[in-house]
């Protein structure tokens, strides 16, 4: 129901009464995938990585991470093929090509339940040769050249908690405060790699476990990491939400949408102190962030 492709909705449509226009079309730019505390307050899908304003309960003002592609030391300008854009509540995918269309990058990105931001990249070259990926994150910049990980420390809004970001990728090593990896491609034979930024919080020990499984554990494989995150998300619905089917499709659609909206607005940060120590709903999570105290009992239950 929540799947979207391309840049729809784009503000126009057609029904029995004819063509119509409406305001507020988002062009499929907001990222539906989110963690129990982390999400993209704003999202720039036409750039590789998690570009936009990352939120951890609220805005941080930072990108998650950016990714550059270069060939022979020459940075490539990539353009998104928006027709390839597809989004579901558990992942977002799109495709990029360089100017002469010799390089294609298919990106699949998602945020795990415990706030690990993961991007899988499948890269194809029509000519073969070396392709270098360089990734940078304002959250994690500490590490010596040759290390396999960058780290950092960040106090979230109002100093409600501190997160300890960890940033790594398959075959990536630290160079000048960034992560870099060079892939040697055969012509028209795709290779897949991935990057992960874990927004680690001491009060959420699973955030460390989920990150380390992707860093050097049993989910280092991009396909395994993706499958684990998507099936975990889908299983949450099976375990927590009753299935509703009526004779009226519009009723079903409304019920599904409201359940999804409640899930998207849910904050389960387990923060210390008398702030967000319990699950709650943040009404308008991409807007005015009004906590609905009335629903706390329901979410705790």
Explain the meaning of each model-derived region.
Residues 225-301:
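Substrate-binding groove/exosite segments of carbohydrate-active enzymes
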Residues 1-249:
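Terminal accessory carbohydrate-recognition/targeting modules of carbohydrate-active enzymes
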């Amino acid at each position: 129901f929540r799947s979207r492709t391309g840049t729809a909705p784009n503000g126009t449509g057609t029904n029995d009464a004819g063509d119509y226009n409406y305001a507020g079309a988002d062009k499929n730019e907001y990222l539906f995938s989110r963690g129990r505390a982390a999400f993209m307050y704003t999202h720039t899908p036409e750039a590789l990585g998690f570009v936009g304003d990352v939120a951890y309960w609220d805005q941080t003002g930072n990108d998650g991470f950016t990714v550059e592609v270069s060939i022979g030391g020459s940075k490539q300008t990539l353009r998104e093929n928006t027709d390839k854009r597809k989004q579901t509540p558990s992942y977002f995918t799109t495709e990029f090509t360089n100017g002469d269309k010799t390089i294609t990058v298919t990106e699949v990105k998602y945020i795990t339940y415990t706030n690990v931001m993961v991007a899988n990249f499948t890269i194809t070259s029509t000519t073969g040769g070396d392709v270098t990926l360089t990734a940078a994150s304002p959250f994690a910049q500490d590490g010596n050249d040759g290390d396999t990980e960058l780290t950092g420390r960040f106090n979230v809004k109002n100093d409600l908690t501190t997160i300890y970001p960890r940033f790594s990728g398959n075959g990536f090593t630290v160079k000048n405060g960034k992560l870099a990896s060079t892939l040697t491609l055969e012509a028209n034979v795709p290779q897949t790699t991935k990057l992960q930024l874990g927004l680690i919080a001491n009060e959420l020990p699973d955030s460390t476990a989920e990150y380390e499984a992707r860093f050097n554990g049993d989910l280092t494989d991009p396909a395994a990491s993706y499958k684990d995150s998507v099936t975990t998300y889908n299983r949450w619905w099976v375990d927590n939400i009753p299935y509703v089917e009526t004779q009226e499709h519009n009723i079903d659609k409304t019920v599904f949408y409201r359940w999804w909206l409640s899930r998207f607005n849910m904050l389960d940060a387990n923060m210390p102190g008398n702030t967000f120590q319990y699950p709650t709903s943040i009404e308008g999570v991409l807007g005015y962030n009004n906590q609905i105290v009335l629903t706390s009992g329901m979410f705790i239950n």
